[in-house]
C-alpha cells in the first residue's frame, strides 16, 4: 500500500498503466459547494466561499480502487483552468499532469476512518475499517486546487510494478 500512497508522479498514469483499458472514472458528485473547514483553510478561502467539489471513483472495470475528492476554487477555474470544470468522466490527473508537472505545495498521508466519509461514498467501499488516504495541495498557473485520495482494499490487487 505504501507505494500507492506515496506515489510522487501521476496516480492516474500509474493506474492506467496497470489496468489498461479496464481503467475508468465514475463521477459520484460534482458541483459548487462549501468545502470542509480544513479544506477552505488550506486553500485560503474566505468563510462562506464556495468551490467546485468533485468526488469520483477510480476503477478497474467495476472494481473501486480509489475514491478521490477535488476542491477547486472559482479563481482556479478561470482562463486555462476553465477546462477543469468540464472533465466529465476524464480523470483530473490526466489534465493536471498533462503538459508539465503541477507544483505540489503540500502533502499529507494518514489512516482515515470510513465513518467520516459521506454515506453514499462509504457504501460498497469494501472497507471494514480505516483506509489510507493522502491529500495534496497543487497550483496550476499560480492558482490552488486540493486533491484527496483514499485507497480502497481492492487497490492491493493492482500490480505494484506499474
From Swiss-Prot:
GO cellular component, one term: cytosol
Keywords, ordered alphabetically: Cytoplasm, Lyase, Pyruvate, Ubiquinone biosynthesis
Residues engaged in binding substrate: 54, 92, 149
Principal EC category: lyase
Top-level division of the source organism's lineage: Bacteria
Record localization: Cytoplasm
UniProt main location, coarse: cytoplasm
GO terms of biological process kind: pyruvate biosynthetic process; ubiquinone biosynthetic process
Function: Removes the pyruvyl group from chorismate, with concomitant aromatization of the ring, to provide 4-hydroxybenzoate (4HB) for the ubiquinone pathway.
Family membership: Belongs to the UbiC family.
Protein name: Probable chorismate pyruvate-lyase
UniProt source species: Methylococcus capsulatus (strain ATCC 33009 / NCIMB 11132 / Bath)
Gene designation per UniProt: ubiC
Amino acid at each position: 500500500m505504501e507505494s500507492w500512497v506515496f506515489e510522487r508522479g501521476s496516480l492516474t498514469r500509474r493506474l492506467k498503466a496497470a489496468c489498461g483499458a479496464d481503467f475508468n472514472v465514475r463521477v459520484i458528485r460534482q458541483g459548487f459547494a462549501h468545502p470542509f473547514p480544513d479544506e477552505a483553510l488550506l486553500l485560503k478561502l474566505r468563510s462562506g466561499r464556495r468551490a467546485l467539489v468533485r468526488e469520483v471513483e477510480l476503477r478497474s472495470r467495476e472494481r473501486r480502487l480509489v475514491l478521490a475528492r477535488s476542491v477547486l476554487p472559482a479563481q482556479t477555474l478561470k482562463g486555462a483552468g476553465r477546462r477543469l470544470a468540464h472533465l466529465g468522466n476524464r480523470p483530473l490527473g490526466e489534465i493536471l499532469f498533462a503538459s508539465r508537472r503541477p507544483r505540489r505545495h503540500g502533502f499529507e498521508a494518514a489512516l482515515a476512518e470510513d465513518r467520516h466519509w459521506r454515506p453514499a461514498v462509504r457504501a460498497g467501499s469494501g472497507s471494514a475499517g480505516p483506509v489510507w488516504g493522502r491529500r495534496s495541495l497543487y497550483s496550476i498557473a499560480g492558482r490552488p486546487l486540493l486533491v484527496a485520495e483514499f485507497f480502497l482494499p481492492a487497490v492491493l490487487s493492482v500490480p505494484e510494478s506499474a
